[in-house]
Regions:
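C-terminal active-site subregion of NodB/CE4 polysaccharide deacetylases
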Residues: 53-167, 234-236, 240-265, 271-379
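Substrate-binding cleft of extracellular glycoside hydrolase catalytic domains
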Residues: 149-150, 159-191, 219
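Extracellular mucin-like PTS domains
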Residues: 25-60
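C-terminal motif of bacterial Sec signal peptides marking the signal peptidase cleavage site
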Residues: 14-16
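Acidic (Asp/Glu)-rich catalytic clusters
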Residues: 182-190, 204-226, 282, 319-323
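Short loop/turn segments at strand-loop or loop-helix junctions that form parts
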Residues: 108-113, 198, 226-231
Length: 379
């Protein structure tokens, strides 16, 4: 009974405690929501692929054509070249600033033009022959040039007329000779003439000749070049260095004194020369030399020479080829028979033009591959 009452009062007490408990208030503060993190995916970098370089094709230069040959040239007088640098040759050959391929020069040698009634020797022509020759040159379109123009053409292909002639008068003639025969061609066609002058100073006659030539030189249409001092003994094999230097340096000294110029060409007296005389001439800065051998016309890097004595020309024609310096042994036509060669020379020029055009693409391709990286493009 006692235990039942104790249990009753305990339950009653607990019920009272439960009834007096305050109700739980609802929260008034809003809960701050933490946003859900959104993951932004960056695009994956695509690796740059470096292309493997394509191998540059190696260009093989074509074979260059052979030296121009022509049926109008005597086979015992073959053309010789003299420019060792192939690239420089092609550059100068095809430059639009220079002479066109096929440009040709005729050097013509004069000794004496005889008046009517005079006896005509082996190396002389009459006035009528002179007029025919000059008229033949003019009618075919030839134009006269100076020694300096010829040197520029032969060395660098500088521009000259496509058909050119250089008139060279050997030995010593009075001013009246030049005024009578060559001045009309200067006045009419602007053709200069070269006076291959013997620079002797032996007596009063020589002194008077020098005065005469000084006046003629000052007029500007006569181009003076060296023809020795003693002259009568050629500078061929066997003569002394002292004699050769007297002929070459003696001409230079005389030209400086009387003409205020230095000759650039030696017209070999008697046509005679040697390896030694050419070596000494080069040391004295002569640029050109002329023989008396009529082997053919001249073109850029193309000089016809003889390599040995032949029955065609005989022993008097000293071979120039073995000298290995074509510009110092240039051939000359004789005034006595130059006229009959003019048509063939024109044909040689025409054939050379055709041959050059036939091979132009090949030569320009070679230049582009081998030469352009160093010399640049051809203007």
């Amino acid at each position: 009974m006692r235990q039942s009452l104790s249990l009753f009062f305990l339950l009653l007490f607990l019920a009272g405690c439960a009834g007096s408990a305050a109700p739980m208030a609802s929260p008034t503060a809003s809960a701050t929501l933490i946003p859900t993190a959104t993951q932004t995916l960056s695009p994956t970098d695509t690796p740059t692929i470096t292309p493997i370089p394509t191998a540059t094709a190696v260009r093989t230069p074509p074979a260059l054509p052979e030296v121009f040959q022509t049926a109008f040239q005597n086979p015992v007088d073959p053309p010789h070249t003299y420019i060792a640098n192939t690239c420089q040759y092609l550059h100068d050959k095809w430059s639009s600033d220079n002479s066109a391929p096929g440009t040709v020069v005729i050097p013509v040698m004069f000794h004496s033009i005889m008046a009517p009634g005079d006896t005509i020797g082996d190396n002389q022509i009459s006035q009528a022959q002179f007029t025919q020759l000059m008229g033949g040159l003019e009618s075919r379109g030839f134009l006269g040039i100076t020694t300096a123009q010829l040197a520029g053409f032969l060395y660098h292909n500088t521009k000259i007329p496509p058909l050119s002639v250089i008139l060279i008068v050997d030995d010593r003639h009075h001013a009246q000779y030049f005024n009578q025969y060559f001045l009309p061609w200067w006045q009419g066609d602007q053709w200069p003439v070269v006076n291959a002058w013997i620079s002797a100073s032996r007596d009063s006659i020589d002194a008077a000749l020098w005065k005469e030539q000084e006046t003629l030189n000052a007029e500007g249409w006569v181009d003076y070049e060296a023809h020795g001092v003693v002259h009568n003994t050629p500078m061929w094999p066997g003569v002394s260095d002292a004699y050769i230097m007297g002929e070459l340096q003696g001409s230079i000294d005389a030209f400086k004194a009387h003409f205020n110029k230095v000759p650039i060409a030696i017209i070999w007296p008697g046509g005679g020369f040697s390896a030694r005389s050419i070596q000494l001439a080069r040391q004295l800065n002569y640029q050109l030399g002329f023989t008396t051998n009529a082997r053919g016309p001249l073109m850029f890097n193309w000089v016809p020479l003889g390599d040995k004595i032949t029955s065609v020309h005989g022993p008097d024609w000293q071979p120039e080829g073995p000298i290995n310096d074509p510009l110092m042994v240039l051939p000359r036509y004789r005034d006595t028979d130059a006229l009959k060669h003019l048509d063939d020379i024109v044909k040689i020029s025409q054939d050379a033009v055709a041959y050059a055009q036939q091979n132009k693409a090949t030569e320009l391709e070679y230049y582009d591959i081998v030469c352009a990286p160093t010399l640049g493009s051809i203007p």
